[in-house]
Amino acid sequence: MVVLHSEITPDISYVLTAGHSCEERKFPKRVIDGVEIKKLKTNYEVVSYHGRKHQAVVVAMDKRWDLCLLQVKGVSRNIKAVPIAEEGPKRGVKYYNLAAPRGLFGRGMVLTFEGYYSGNFMAGYDTYTISTKPGSSGSSILNKDGEIVGIIFAGFPSVEKVGLSPVFASISIFVAKAYAQGELNLWKLYNMNADTTETTTQTPK
């Protein structure tokens, strides 16, 4: 979900998702007809609600809380950024989740789930009674005002309606720091007269 637009480059926005969605995949070396094949990099693509595809690069990841912030090119400024809530979730309050479990998603269609915040569990993760399946990871949990209070990163296969999110404070801190880093990188490129449409795939010296 788009959480911020760049103040440096008009066609760059920031999308928040789960950290494991941004991890580099490991591929074994392959030899075909005597030629060694190596994977050079992973490309990322974000698909909007309207079905448009946008190139993306990783700005930052937090492995402890399983968070990732992407820089995305070409998102319209008419698309409103979804803010991080000023206050975290409260026990017994209903929250909403927009997700694509099992990849069930189409142009102009996104599944909406609802459930209640139940408190902290295990290693301090925020726990919700929201249905999750593979494909739900990285989807936002919203309050009634449409503000982000959580990000689904895991569930329990044996329990239908349990969703885990990084603790709320970790999300707001991560987004603030990662956004600042992404904007700093763009500012450096801008002042080097570099092509900022390449986003942070270019690393300023």
Give the positions of each predicted feature.
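Catalytic nucleophile loop of clan PA
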Residues: V2, S131-I152
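Short, solvent-exposed secondary-structure boundary/capping segments
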Residues: W65-V72, G124-I130
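N-terminal activation segment of mature serine protease catalytic domains
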Residues: M1-A18, K26, V57, L67, ...
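Terminal peptide-recognition signature
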Residues: S13, T17, A56, L70, ...
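Flexible, gly/ser-rich surface segments that form the specificity/activation loops bordering the active-site cleft
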Residues: R77-D126, S131-S136, I152-L164
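Active-site substrate-binding loop(s) of clan PA
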Residues: V2-S6, E24-E36, V57-M61, Q71-G106
